[in-house]
Amino acid sequence: MTISYLPKEEHLLEGTDEQMKRLTSAGIPRTDVEVKIFDDHDSELPPGKMGEIVVKGEVVMKGYWRNPLATSETLRGGWLHTGDLGVMDEKGYVYILDRAKDMIISGGENIYSREIEDIILLHPAVHEVAVIGVPDETWGEAIKAIVALKEGQKATKEDIINFCKEHLASFKKPKSVEFIDAIPKNPYGKVLKRELREKYWAGEARRVR
């Protein structure tokens, strides 16, 4: 950030392309905090490679109150795993690009996909479901349910949304529903949510809002 006090008629403030690009970054770490980018095996990645943003320092929490499981999942090897995906450039600037944790931020509310998925799976016509966040001009992200129905079963978008309204807070119900034949998974059975999100976020520099 640059603060100046000059008559606009006689001064023009310009930045290089490199400097202007860094306006989209989260900045550089504080001197008392270490920030690195880790891969899926908790190994450090070189500049420019996308991975999970991890943090270490005296200002980092020691753990979650009375929740050792969450603590062990988030604090590993002395590093706090933020759940955000990003890159760090050669100068140490960090860019947040996507979210590793299965969370949607809509209208300022943190919404966990798993909670919504567990409810939708209770619907008698639903075989599988994946809940993702898609871009929304008003809410930042909107909740979208991608549903595979059981063979021979039928359900409409309204059926799924109304079912969620009966069991969830209003802000957690999906704003849209898409029906597909099968939910894509990797060989280990993990749902490929990034693949599902891609067509909605294509063209966006960042996968978070």
For each predicted feature, which ranges?
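Conserved ATP-binding loop and adjacent catalytic segment of the adenylate-forming AMP-binding
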Residues: 1-33, 47-51, 61-62, 76-77, ...
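Short beta-strand-to-turn element immediately C-terminal to the catalytic PLP-Schiff-base lysine
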Residues: 3-8, 38-39, 56
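Generic short beta-strand
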Residues: 20, 35-36, 85, 182
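Generic structural signal for residues in well-ordered beta-strands
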Residues: 35, 129-131, 177
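AMP-binding/adenylate-forming catalytic core of the ANL superfamily
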Residues: 41-44, 57, 62-66, 73, ...
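Acidic/polar alpha-helix N-cap and adjacent early helical turns
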Residues: 198-209
